[in-house]
C-alpha cells in the first residue's frame, strides 16, 4: 500500500464537477491558463487522471492500494494547492477558490469509486473559512473520501493564525474527531513565498 500517492484531473475534466454558477467563469479562466508544471503536460501527465493506466502502473509496481493527495491545479488556483498560496484578493476570489477545491474533491470521490477498496482519497479544504471547511469535511465523509483532510500549510503572509490557535481551529479539530477523519499534512506545504530564483523550489 502506498501512503503518499498523488492524482488529480486534467484541467478541463474538472468542468462537470463545478457548481453551475462557476462554469462560465471557469471557461474564461481555462482559456488563458497555462499549466505551470512540465510533468503534467508531458507523456506521464495522464498517470494523474487515467484510471486504467494508473491501475496498470500500480500493479506493475506491486501496489494494491493507495492514499491519494492532490497533484494537479484546482480550478481558479494560481498553482498547486500543496504549495504557498497568497491570500484571496477579494471575496469573489475566495469563493472561486472554494469552488475549485469542491470540484477537485468531487472528481476525487468519483475517481476513487471506480476501484472500490484500492483508492483512499484525501479531501482538500481552505482554512480561510472554517465553517465552510467543516461542511466540506462532512460531505467528504459521506462521499467516501475516507483518507481524511489535507491540512494546508500556514506560512507567514497568508493571513491566517498559526495552527496551534485553538480558538480559530478548535471547531475544525472537533469535527474531524467526531467524524473519525484523519488529519494529513504534506511536507513542504508551509514553505513561505520565495523569489523566482532557480534554487527556490529546493525549499519545498
Question: What name fits each language-model region?
Answer:
Residues 1-204:
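Helix-coil boundary/capping segments in enzymes
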